[in-house]
Amino acid sequence: MVSSRASRRKRASATDIYKTCKQSGTCPPDVVNKVEGTTLADRFLQWASLGIFLGGLGIGTGTGTGGRTGYIPLGGRPSTVVDVTPARPPVVIEPVGPTEPSIVQLVEESSVVSSGTPIPTFTGTSGFEITSSATTTPAVLDITPASGSVQISTTSYTNPAFADPSLIEVPQTGEVSGNIFVTTPTSGTHGYEEIPMQVFASHGTGTEPISSTPVPGVSRVAGPRLYSRAYHQVRVNNFDFVTRPSSFVTFDNPAFEPGDTSLTFEPADTAPDPDFLDIVRLHRPALTSRRGTVRFSRLGKKATMFTRRGTQIGAQVHYYHDISNITATEDIEMQPLLTSESTDGLYDIYADADIDNAMLHTTSHTGSTGPRSHLSFPSIPSTVSTKYSNTTIPFTTSWDIPVTTGPDIVLPTASPNLPFVPPTSIDTTVAIAIQGSNYYLLPLLYYFLKKRKRIPYFFTDGFVAV
């Protein structure tokens, strides 16, 4: 079985390959030599042509063309085409002599000038004839009115040059005082018109949208970023920058200068202030607060360079002047209205001024555990006119002194013998017996498991802290 061979694809011509690969420099050497004529055969012919003449023979490495005249077939001659030149009329060239004028007249001379159509002439007496006739019949017009109704029309015109005094309208009295209110009589019948009133805004909750598509939230206008890297910061210490900013850029007359608008200047070589050199525009001012000061700011644009197209190139500068400092809030110390004295170790006790049978005595008892004391309160004279008075007495928190209730609490039965409280240390738990109808235990003896609270000590009417 004969296997089929793949068909060989024809390569592009050397000229096509040379056009595409010459620019990139990837042409094969044989293609370059063939197109440029630098093959070995071409070089041999060049060397041989130095000694012999081979011109016109068409000998070369290229396609054979037979030279300039082509190949001549055997047994015949090549067909030739004879070009016949069309005949042209001869042009007579007239020589110009030295005495003849050199001005060429484009229009030939003519002695006859056409004057147009001649005007016709009329001869004789013929023409329009005018005849006159005379009649003796007078022209009589019939002025007898025709039968029927008679219509009379009258038309009057007013002459502005003359006006009858009876037709002049008397001018009304005008108000020359400062009162702008015109009063009208209230008596009688007055005409009026009822106009229905329309409600423009109904009462609602106040949250209804005022547009068809309300924008959620509040949109705020972003302030100028004056302290970014795009602006060069320049501080101006002169206060004239606030009132007369143009005096720093140009030498002009400050008779009129708007201070709240943008200012435009022409480029100048010099400026009163070197910091304002090449400034062509100062924007409108802005008041800001920066680090505890009220600051007056203006943005300026410089035109340092100009391109050939007229484009201005320059930096943007932030000029600012601190007007005043924002002082911090002063801390005013509050003064007390009443002077207070030190009451270390003193407590206030409300006592009844009407009780006279109470006595202050201290009794010492000696036992097996130690001595003990008993403290009672006598009747204290009142310093005010009310029933109860406030008297300050010294008081110490000793463990061996039991305290009874105040004299203002009347008990139904009172025991003459007070219970004995043995002195113990603070670290150990003791049992406390207090005679009274109402009392609070010492907060130090409470056992708090999780959270502790600060409980104040009270020693007032009916409340005793031990």
UniProtKB/Swiss-Prot annotation:
It is found in: Virion; Host nucleus; Host early endosome; Host Golgi apparatus. The gene is L2. This is Minor capsid protein L2. Disulfide bonds join C21-C27. Interacts with major capsid protein L1. Interacts with E2; this interaction inhibits E2 transcriptional activity but not the DNA replication function E2. Interacts with host GADD45GIP1. Interacts with host HSPA8; this interaction is required for L2 nuclear translocation. Interacts with host importins KPNB2 and KPNB3. Forms a complex with importin alpha2-beta1 heterodimers via interaction with the importin alpha2 adapter. Interacts with host DYNLT1; this interaction is essential for virus intracellular transport during entry. A motif (Nuclear localization signal) lies at residues 1-12, 447-455. Pfam families: Late_protein_L2. It comes from the Viruses. GO terms for molecular function: DNA binding; structural molecule activity. InterPro entries: Late_L2. Highly phosphorylated. Minor protein of the capsid that localizes along the inner surface of the virion, within the central cavities beneath the L1 pentamers. Plays a role in capsid stabilization through interaction with the major capsid protein L1. Once the virion enters the host cell, L2 escorts the genomic DNA into the nucleus by promoting escape from the endosomal compartments and traffic through the host Golgi network. One of its GO terms (cellular component) is host cell endosome. Belongs to the papillomaviridae L2 protein family. The keyword Phosphoprotein applies. Keywords: Capsid protein, Cytoplasmic inwards viral transport, Disulfide bond, DNA-binding, Host endosome, Host Golgi apparatus, Host nucleus, Host-virus interaction, Late protein, Microtubular inwards viral transport, Phosphoprotein, Viral penetration into host nucleus, Virion, Virus entry into host cell. GO terms for biological process: microtubule-dependent intracellular transport of viral material towards nucleus; symbiont entry into host cell; viral penetration into host nucleus.
